[in-house]
């Protein structure tokens, strides 16, 4: 029996190179080997200030990118989180067994809310509980995530264990965390110490998956390096050039040592030019297919409804099982 894999991407802003290398590309490989559930995290998206008019388009665009990148809806279950109401139902049940202190330790809330924690919405604070519900509702065996989500996954495991201990039986599967070594944490093109992010105010901090070829060339050309004239790899002392080398390696499959050796006497200009080209070679087909799919909204909606229908079968089984243990009438 195939193991179950679950993962998703928030439908906020344009998806970028970090989303592709850190998540989506890995999913393409997994769809042949696992029973995969890949969702559009639109409920998570509204924990920040997002316009109603933008959310609908963002959902469709993320779905189009999933498909354009190579996810096959006949092999995997693709759905919008908001179309499977059981996620919210299980989230409430998990809220009722999760100690408040556990949530207060979540660093991502502190990072996103900043100094205005008192003004932040409850949804942002309880975000990790909904994330736990997203995972546990499908009894996922494996959850591929970036390093920045590891704390949330550890919380998910803890919550599953609380439920199982409370009712003295394994109701919820305690998932394994899968963190890929290459491509998981692509950093900003403007600051090698910050993760590439959709929320960064500078568009030149990231390569968006729908960027034109010319814009990709511009962004890589202007990507920050440092004052040294040679290429070397050290994430602590040379984070920016190390990030560019990581991106090159992710596409070329060559070792960092070989890449450095190839460009040792050619300087940054040639390296950046070739890096832009290798990115374009890989992203252009995805961009073109995405634009084509965005013109067929009827097809995209069909995929969402089909995926949600399939997901709800699995999700409702888990929710009813948990509700029964709590004592609710099913």
UniProtKB/Swiss-Prot annotation:
What is the catalytic activity of this protein? Answer: tRNA(Trp) + L-tryptophan + ATP = L-tryptophyl-tRNA(Trp) + AMP + diphosphate + H(+)
Quote the cellular component terms of the Gene Ontology held in the record. Answer: cytoplasm
What Pfam families has UniProt attached to this entry?
tRNA-synt_1b
Q: Where does ATP bind?
A: 10-12, 18-19, 146-148, 186, 195-199
Record-annotated residues binding L-tryptophan?
134
EC number(s) per UniProt?
6.1.1.2
Q: Where is this motif: 'KMSKS' region?
A: 195-199
What InterPro entries does this protein map onto? aa-tRNA-synth_Ic, Rossmann-like_a/b/a_fold, Trp-tRNA-ligase, Trp-tRNA-ligase_bac-type, Trp-tRNA_synthetase
Q: Where is this motif: 'HIGH' region?
A: 11-19
Q: Which UniProt keywords apply?
A: Aminoacyl-tRNA synthetase, ATP-binding, Cytoplasm, Ligase, Nucleotide-binding, Protein biosynthesis
Q: What are the BP-aspect GO terms?
A: tryptophanyl-tRNA aminoacylation
Gene Ontology MF terms: ATP binding; tryptophan-tRNA ligase activity
**Per its UniProt entry, what is the enzyme's top EC class, as one word?**
ligase
CDD domains noted in UniProt: TrpRS_core (cd00806)
Q: Where is it located?
A: Cytoplasm
UniProt lists the family membership as follows: Belongs to the class-I aminoacyl-tRNA synthetase family.
Subunit record text: Homodimer.
Q: What is the purpose of this protein?
A: Catalyzes the attachment of tryptophan to tRNA(Trp).
Please identify the protein, giving its name as recorded.
Tryptophan--tRNA ligase
């Amino acid at each position: 029996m195939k193991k179950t894999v679950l993962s998703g991407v928030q439908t906020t802003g344009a998806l970028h190179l970090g989303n592709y290398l850190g998540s989506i590309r890995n999913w393409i490989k997994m769809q042949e080997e696992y029973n995969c559930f890949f969702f559009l995290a639109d409920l998570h998206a509204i924990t920040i200030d997002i316009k109603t008019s933008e959310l609908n388009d963002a959902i469709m665009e993320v779905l189009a990118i999933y498909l354009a990148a190579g996810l096959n809806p006949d092999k995997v279950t693709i759905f919008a989180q908001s179309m499977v109401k059981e996620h919210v139902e299980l989230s409430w049940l998990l809220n009722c067994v999760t100690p408040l202190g556990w949530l207060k330790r979540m660093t991502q809330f502190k990072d996103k809310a900043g100094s205005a924690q008192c003004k932040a919405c409850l949804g942002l604070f309880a975000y990790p509980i909904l994330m736990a519900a997203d995972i546990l509702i499908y009894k996922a065996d494996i959850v591929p995530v970036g390093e920045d989500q590891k704390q949330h996954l550890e919380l998910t495991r803890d919550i599953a264990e609380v439920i199982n201990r409370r009712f003295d039986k394994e109701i919820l599967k305690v998932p394994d965390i899968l963190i890929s070594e290459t491509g998981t944490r692509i950093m900003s093109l403007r600051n090698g110490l910050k993760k590439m992010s959709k929320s960064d105010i500078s568009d030149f901090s990231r390569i968006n998956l729908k960027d034109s070829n010319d814009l990709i060339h511009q962004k890589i050309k202007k990507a920050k390096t440092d004052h040294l004239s040679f290429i070397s790899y050290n994430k602590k002392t040379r984070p920016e050039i190390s990030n560019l080398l990581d991106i090159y390696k992710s596409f070329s499959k060559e070792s960092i040592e070989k890449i450095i050796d190839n460009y040792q006497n050619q300087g940054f200009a040639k390296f950046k030019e070739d890096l832009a080209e290798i990115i374009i070679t890989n992203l252009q087909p995805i961009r073109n297919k995405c634009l084509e799919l965005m013109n067929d909204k009827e097809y995209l909606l069909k995929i969402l409804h089909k995926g949600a229908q399939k997901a709800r079968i699995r999700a409702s089984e888990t929710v009813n099982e948990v509700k029964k243990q709590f004592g609710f009438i099913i």
